């Protein structure tokens, strides 16, 4: 797991869903692992990969294959995501559509609707009163400068926690 200590509570005012949209775009390539090659390599070296954004954090989960080279490759890819992510405008519309579908699926569940209404009643339409996934009008208003600024501000070693568990050589990983 790589956990960034930033979530939807850090979304700029009027830009709800920015942290979640960035999470989606963070699978689309870096300076050294271009475009969809990033996701292809994640798929090659993991049994499963996923991500989520909540109010306080953004998490990237990788269940790494048991081959010795797999862990090193995933650590490399996560370091690329942390320091060399390339955000591309061409992916934004399709990722907004995915976020929109995720929101529809979530809001199709009665408990989620209840929680959303309770949080809105308690906090209004800001901070904890809005879902981390954001609202469509706000998502559509997010621009590349805002995404890049959020990334540069929050995706950094001093704002991340990496958790590695399983059978591996601790000394080798730390080197």
Model-derived regions: residue spans:
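M16 family metallopeptidases and their MPP-like homologs
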Residues: 1-21, 36-80, 111-137, 159-165
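Acidic/histidine-enriched alpha-helical segments
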Residues: 39, 86-104, 169
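Hydrophobic alpha-helical scaffolding
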Residues: 85, 104, 108, 137-140, ...
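Non-catalytic, conformational "gating/processing" segments within enzyme and secreted inhibitor domains
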Residues: 111, 144, 148-175
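Short acidic/His-enriched helical or mixed secondary-structure segments at domain edges of catalytic enzymes
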Residues: 98-117
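M16/insulysin-pitrilysin zinc metalloprotease superfamily fold
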Residues: 29-32, 63-96, 174
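Short amphipathic beta-strand starts and helix->beta connectors
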Residues: 43-47, 141-149
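Active-site-flanking alpha-helical
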Residues: 23-27
């Amino acid at each position: 797991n790589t956990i960034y200590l930033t979530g939807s509570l850090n979304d700029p005012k009027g830009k709800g869903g920015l942290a979640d949209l960035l999470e989606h775009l963070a699978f689309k390539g870096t300076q050294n692992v271009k475009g969809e090659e990033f996701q292809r390599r994640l798929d090659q070296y993991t049994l499963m990969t996923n991500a989520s954004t909540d109010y306080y954090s953004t998490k990237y989960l990788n269940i790494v294959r048991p081959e010795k080279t797999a862990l090193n490759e995933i650590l490399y890819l996560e370091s690329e995501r942390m320091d060399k992510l390339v955000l591309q405008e061409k992916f934004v519309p399709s990722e907004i559509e995915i976020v929109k579908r995720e929101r529809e699926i979530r809001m199709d569940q009665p408990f989620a609707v209840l929680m959303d209404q309770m949080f809105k009643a308690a906090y209004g339409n800001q901070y904890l009163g809005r879902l981390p996934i954001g609202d469509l009008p706000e998502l559509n208003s997010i621009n590349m400068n805002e995404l890049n600024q959020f990334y540069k501000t929050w995706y950094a070693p001093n704002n991340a926690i990496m958790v590695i568990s399983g059978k591996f050589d601790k000394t080798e990983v730390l080197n």
